[in-house]
């Protein structure tokens, strides 16, 4: 079955989309504590504390991911963060059952070749080993 060639406007739209993606990565790369090669970030995402986020090589972060990295977040090489994932390295301190407005910052480590599935929540202080599926 022969398909017609994509229209010029569709090809231009695709090229523009690819260019915008590259520019977003370049801008984020400057803000991250570290960013590897061949990183893919689909939009929209929310990243707070980007200067405490380290992303390895060939990492993919999908749309609607929220990352609160103020306590430090490290994502290892070849890892995939599926859509709608929440990663938070800060929480409120609970002392004797009493709520405190002060925040507790605990680093998160996501190993190499990790797949974090859709709607997962990674909480402060969590360490996920290499080759894991969450």
Spans of features found by a protein language model:
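Terminal amphipathic alpha-helical/low-complexity segments used for targeting or macromolecular assembly
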Residues: 1-38, 78, 92-94, 113, ...
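Flexible, glycine/small-residue-enriched loop-and-beta-strand segment within the central core
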Residues: 45-55, 60-127
